[in-house]
Amino acid sequence: MEHCTFNLPDVQASKPSIAINLTRVGVTNMKKLVEIKRKDKRPIVLISTFDVFVDLPSDRKGANLSRNFEAVDEVLEKVLSTPVYEIEQLCSDIAHNLLGRHEYANQAEVRMKSEYMIRRASPSTGIKCQEVVNIFAEASAVRGVGDKDYFDVKKLIGAEVVGMTACPCAQEIMRDKAANELAELGVDRDTIIRFLEKVPMATHNQRGRGIISIKVAHDFDVSLESIIRIIERSMSSSVYEVLKRSDEKVVVETAHMNPKFVEDCVRAMADNIVKEFPNLPDNAVITIKQINEESIHRHNAFAERVALMGELRSEINQ
């Protein structure tokens, strides 16, 4: 009996009925377990979500999406055998791998986001607790014009950290009221001034979310831990999962002794970035955001700065 052989058509490689380029074609919400090894420390285990894209030329109906999964899995296997690794380098390697697999594409993009658990101790009693920080990384690879085997890779690393802010405006109103009340009770002016310097006045608070991302060329590394520290210390106070009464006193007092507008937080982050990363190239792209969830309003307060590192250095060091 003679067997028939069928050649399955490559539908993706056929020509589309409407011949236009597509900027991004790929997969989103791809869940992967990522283990990042660290020097002399326990590895970080992350449940990560990936978005993976390539561009598509006008003469091709579709992309080979299975290659996206192959590219991610191959790089994740490589990570397991590497002693030290960064999540932005993971995205960079995946983007590079994608262009190698999608010969028809000129650029590839990878986005990754995870929840990163960090250990914290409460400020007074030292109770250990875990805090969640949202971290994210991105990478883009562009094929060279004259050399198809050359890929220009850019990578981005960032974090979003929750903290606390205290409103300076309402605090000044309450400070003025306290001064007037004390004066009516017969307290002398010098005593009132000393009292107000030692005891912070009431104000309304916000739960703030500070966000920093730094985009650099593939051969520069940016410390994620440094980004997290910068965001934390740029608000009025850190927040903690577990607090005893003495801890609450420290947190509330710290925040109200250090009141900040949403704009102050962004400027503080910018200043700390310049101080923390003296070797970062001038063409690094810095994005800083602060979102404060108001307690006495229905709206949120927002501030942002997007700049090159060189621009921030010039403004802050002038």
Swiss-Prot record:
GO terms for biological process: tetrahydromethanopterin biosynthetic process. Pathway: Cofactor biosynthesis; 5,6,7,8-tetrahydromethanopterin biosynthesis. Keywords: Hydrolase, Iron, Metal-binding. Its cofactor is Fe(2+). The record marks 167 as: May be catalytically important. It catalyses: GTP + H2O = 7,8-dihydroneopterin 2',3'-cyclic phosphate + formate + diphosphate + H(+). Its EC number is 3.5.4.39. GO terms for molecular function: GTP cyclohydrolase activity; GTP cyclohydrolase I activity; GTP cyclohydrolase IV activity; iron ion binding. The keyword Manganese does not apply. InterPro entries: GTP_cyclohydrolase_FolE2/MptA, GTP_cyclohydrolase_MptA. Gene3D superfamilies: Urate Oxidase. Binds 1 Fe(2+) ion per subunit. Pfam families: GCHY-1. Converts GTP to 7,8-dihydro-D-neopterin 2',3'-cyclic phosphate, the first intermediate in the biosynthesis of coenzyme methanopterin. Belongs to the GTP cyclohydrolase IV family. Homodimer. This is GTP cyclohydrolase MptA. It comes from Methanosarcina acetivorans (strain ATCC 35395 / DSM 2834 / JCM 12185 / C2A). The lineage of its organism: Archaea, Methanobacteriati, Methanobacteriota, Stenosarchaea group, Methanomicrobia.
